[in-house]
């Protein structure tokens, strides 16, 4: 190919940015899944603890023990509320990361399309030059044969 793609540095930069956006999106998705798992764990733990409270109530509890169960359930509820907010925040971060990835990918595809078009144009030019060389060679070959026939 005669001419190098003039936007190759930009194409390389866009590829690097897209790779970084992909890596970052992977981290955001993993963080969101981790936050969801923690929330699920807290909700399961609360359900188990509430079941223990009901079982203890059927067997009889002292007012102090009942208060301890209720206080602990309130703390678990607070933790669930905080973790729910963390999940919401993590979802927003993931959505933002997806938008960033889409934008970087869109830019990369635009530059990559230009690169492919450039390569195609260069191949067409190269093919025309090769054809011209072959045609000239063929003309010379027949011209030499024609001179031999005249002699």
Pin down the residues of each PLM region.
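Charge-rich amphipathic alpha-helical interaction elements
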Residues: 1-151
């Amino acid at each position: 190919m005669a001419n190098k793609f003039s936007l190759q540095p930009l194409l390389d930069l866009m590829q690097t940015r897209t790779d970084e956006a992909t890596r970052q999106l992977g981290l955001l998705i993993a963080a969101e899944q981790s936050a969801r798992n923690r929330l699920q764990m807290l909700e399961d733990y609360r359900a188990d603890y509430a079941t223990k409270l009901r079982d203890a109530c059927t067997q009889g509890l002292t007012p102090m023990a009942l208060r301890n169960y209720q206080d602990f359930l309130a703390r678990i509820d607070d933790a669930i509320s905080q973790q729910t907010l963390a999940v919401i925040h993590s979802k927003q971060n993931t959505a933002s990361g997806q938008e960033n990835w889409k934008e970087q990918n869109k830019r990369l595809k635009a530059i990559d399309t230009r690169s492919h078009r450039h390569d195609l144009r260069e191949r067409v030019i190269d093919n025309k030059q090769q054809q011209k060389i072959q045609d000239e060679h063929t003309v010379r070959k027949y011209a030499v044969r024609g001179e031999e026939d005249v002699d």
